[in-house]
Structures are given as C-alpha cells and as structure tokens.
Amino acid sequence: MNTQQLKAILGAGLATLALTMTASAEPAQGRVIESADDFAVLSTRERVEPENRMVRERLETLLPRLMAETDLDMWLVINREYAEDPVYFTLVPQPSFAARRTTMLVFHRKADGTVDRLSVNRYPLGEPYQSAWAGGDLDAQWKALGELIVSRNPKRIGVNVSREWPVADGLTAALHDRLREVLPTEFAARLVPAESLVIRWLETRSQSELAVYPHIVGIARGVIAEAFSSRVITPGVTSTQDVAWYIRQRFESLGLPIWFFPDVNRQRQGVPCEADSPFCGGSGVIEPGDVLHTDVGICYLKLCTDTQEMGYVPRLGEVEVPAGLQAAMQTGNRWQDFLTGNFATGRSGNDVLSRTRAAAQKAGINASVYTHALGMFGHAPGPTIGMWDNQGPTAVQGDWPLYASTVYAIEGNIKQAIPEWGGQFVQMKLEQSALFDGERVIYLAGRQTSWHVVR
C-alpha cells in the first residue's frame, strides 16, 4: 500500500503518524501524552450529530458490503424494551436509551446491492429508517412484519442467534418463536444465524471512526499520565485505590463512561513476582521505589478503548528510572513488535498467538499474550489472540481470521529479572489500542515506550 492509499483510508493525520514513527532509533510509534486536557471532549448534546453521522455512514457504506460478504438477503434485529439486543444501539440514531415496546429493524439487500432500512415499530425511529407499519396493537405489528418479509421474498434471512458469540445472540427465545409463528413454513425455513454479519459489523471500522479513534485513545492515555504524576500521587500517603478513584472521577468529570472500574496496583522490591504467576502486583500505600500499573477503559462517540501503562516512583536521590526497569520496558516493546509483526489478513487469532509465542520463546522472553478486538464494545467480537489463562488455541473465537480496518487491544505482559532488585522479576503489563489496516498495525495514539515517573 502506498502513502496516498494509506492516507485515503486513514486520513492524513493517522497516516503521517504511521509513516513517520518507524524511522526513529527508539521503539517505533512511541508517544508521550501528558494530560487529557490536551484533547477536546464534546458535551453530551454535541455528541449526537457526529454519532448519528457515523451510524449513517456505516449503514450506507459498510452494511451493504458486509451483507453481501456474509450472503444474507435480509437481516432482522428484533428486541424489547429493557431486553435489548447487544447490536441494537449500534444501529439506531441518538439520543436513544431503550427499545420502545417491541422494536423491529429490517434490513433488505436488493438486487442492485443497496440495502433498504425499515422499521416496524409503534414509535417510528425516523432517519435513517423508513417506517413500514402504520400502527396498531402487538398482534398487528407481528402480522405486518410477516407480510413485509413475504413481500420482499428474501432467500436467506439472518437472525441474531448464536451458540458461541454472545453479541450475536440477542434474539430472545420468545421473540424467535413468535417470528416463526408469523412466517409461512417456507419462509421460516429460510431463517439462518446472522453471527458472521454481526461480528463483521461490530469489528469493522469506518473512515470516520478511524479519523476520531486516535483522539479517543489519546484522552484515555492522558488521564493515565495525570494519575501517574505528582499531581495525584504523594508517596507515603496516596494509595493505589486513591489513584483508581482519581481515574474514575476524572473520566466522570469529562462525561466519559468507563466500561470497567480502573485497576491500579504496585510491585515492590522484596515482594516476589514468581515466574509462573499470571499476574503480579498488590494494593496499598504507594512508596518510593514502587512500580505502578493501571488498566483503564472508556467509551466515547460509541468507540471504546482499553489501555494499560506502567509508572515508577523514584527513590530519594534517584535521577533516572533504574536501568533494569528501562530494559524491561524495551523488552515489553519488543514483545509487542513480535505480536503485531505476526498480524496478517486471513490469519487466525490462534495462528498469530502460536507465532508470537514461538518468537518470544526464541528470544528468551517470558511473555503471555491475551489480545482482543476493540470497537463498540471493550471486549469486542473478532479474533481472540490468547487468553491470560490459556496460552494455547481458543476454539471458535481463536479461529476467527483477521480482517483489514479492525482495531485491537494489543495486550499481554512480560516478566524480566531486575538487577537493581537482586534479580527479582518485574511484570510489565502493557496494552494499547491499535488499528490493523490489512498490512500492518498502527497504534492509534502511539504506545508507551518510556516510564511514567512520579516526581
């Protein structure tokens, strides 16, 4: 892919970042972010227009292609108030907080490849949907849905039922039964699981989403930088829980929802980290000489992040982070390079895992890989590349192949002996949000290649 093609897909800013950060002597794509204040955050009201614009773009440009790719002529998304299908909110305009009564979305792919977007609802959704029912009671609504399906005569009708993928299993048993009841036997036989479409819909990023995603990740990294600084931490006073709550409240003040509570922990000389322990680190008051770790995730403009970074609290008289810890960061970055270097279109998550583990083992790196897709969910559907408690193949999710225009949490850890700590292991738990463009991996807001230092 040449420079102009990359810019056309990613936008000039992200393409420039990708093309210039590889020439440095430092680990590629490193970036220091100091504060979330360096990034604009829209008010709740201001978010509606860009969110709806991105939803419409996805419906117009992605959905027709993905329905053709997965060989579906029609896709039904049917749910009820307070029992919404996980995919529902990725399809409807904002502001929207719940399905209304029984809400039915119908997507019909026509012979020319375009997709009609229809709603069979008591409360019409408006743009970008066309209402296909004049109103009535619940029985009339179901009758109208059945008649609409028959009139369109689709050969393969996708419904959201799945044994293996939770996000593709949003059609409840009762609604599934009712759907079969209102369809002639011939049409009921055309119902097929839509799980492949749901996964592709949720994992694929549009051009507009890729333009804004680096900004969102930058906000998350900025809050981590604030938290791992003397603005928040007073050694000997501040606890790991204090820092976690700072992160929680900071995102709250920005109006940004978190999708899990922030984790903050510390590793310390004299508190062993065993080579075979899945995770190292404890809670308590932060002291000089501590190694800090945090894991945070936010969602903004319908896109989620997942980020882990490391910090250090210098001892009295220390000017630099100990050389052993700096070397451990470099090893962590090297492990990331092994992982991202094995990304290839069509390659399964299990294959990427196997290749990465082999490369790390050959290099003598004690590493663990547990990388996952990101997008409209923090733990989004897509290829699973290892799990913290399973470094072998993962059935089904691990067999899913990599596609272009998908985003991942490049997540895992390495353990390395620190000479300054008498050979005690330190665990470097690293995670950054990154785009796979079909040829290479680009960190959306750079990655951590140097320590946060609390001074």
Regions found by a protein language model. Name each.
Residues 8-11, 415:
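Short amphipathic alpha-helical "recognition" segments used for binding
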Residues 7-8, 375:
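Intrinsic structural disorder/low-complexity segments
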Residues 1-6:
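N-terminal secretory signal peptides that target proteins for export/translocation
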Residues 11-20:
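Bacterial N-terminal signal peptides
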